[in-house]
Amino acid sequence: MPYLLLCIGCVFLGLGVLGLFVPSLQSLDLLTVQTLSHHRLDYLNSITTFLARVGGMPFVCFLSFLVCMYLAWYKKYITVIFISLGVIGSITMGWLLKWCVNRPRPPEAYHIVESYGASFPSAHSVYASTLACLAMIMLCHKHNINSPYNVLISCLWFVCMGLSRIYAGVHFPTDVLAGWGIGFIWIALLWLWLLQTQSRLSRKQIYF
């Protein structure tokens, strides 16, 4: 499973990177943002604004802190480290890439929410895919089954977050794809590390 996640992440990131260099993809990026800006609805605007708030770094860090405190109370320290590395690592990589690539955002005329930093990759998409992957791993292992509901809700979360950033006019589609890819790749690599750790420690110490 971590290898599948790693492959999907590489595909997403690869498509996102192509958007930086292929003129036809850049034109499609801008056309998508322009088209969505002409078909906005009030209730979708409200949902987009809400997702922009709950999907940002402050809320993600706060939520991760609460989960880690809960796990630390039950002495599940490996899981605390796993989640902490997942969140901190994805945040760091996302913002480092923003600084290095420094891709301009879509024109401000299309924005309906505030935005910070460069466009590539979408930080909200990085956070959303990271949390979705962590949730799928933790919940599936907690119940010892691959619950389709867990997977569905997790997928809906990161997909809706990514689409909302395009709808809001603050990111191009390839920014979102790259953000998803970064989250998937980072968590897949950490998952492989966790599986190696699992061979030395009991399952009870690692998962919820």
Where are these regions (language model features)?
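Alpha-helical transmembrane spans of integral membrane proteins, capturing the lipid-embedded, hydrophobic core
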Residues: 7-11, 83, 87-91, 180, ...
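Short helix-capping/hinge motifs at transmembrane helix termini and TM-loop junctions
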Residues: 21-24, 74-75, 101-102, 168-172
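Membrane-embedded catalytic cores of phosphoryl/pyrophosphoryl-handling enzymes
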Residues: 4-5, 111-208
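Aromatic-anchored segments of alpha-helical transmembrane domains
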Residues: 13-17, 88-93, 156-166
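Alpha-helical transmembrane segments of multi-pass membrane proteins, especially transporters
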Residues: 34, 82-87, 153, 176-180
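Core segments of transmembrane alpha-helices
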Residues: 59-65, 128-132
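N-terminal transmembrane-helix/juxtamembrane module of multi-pass inner/ER membrane proteins
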Residues: 1-59, 99-112
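Membrane-interface loops
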Residues: 31, 73-141, 145
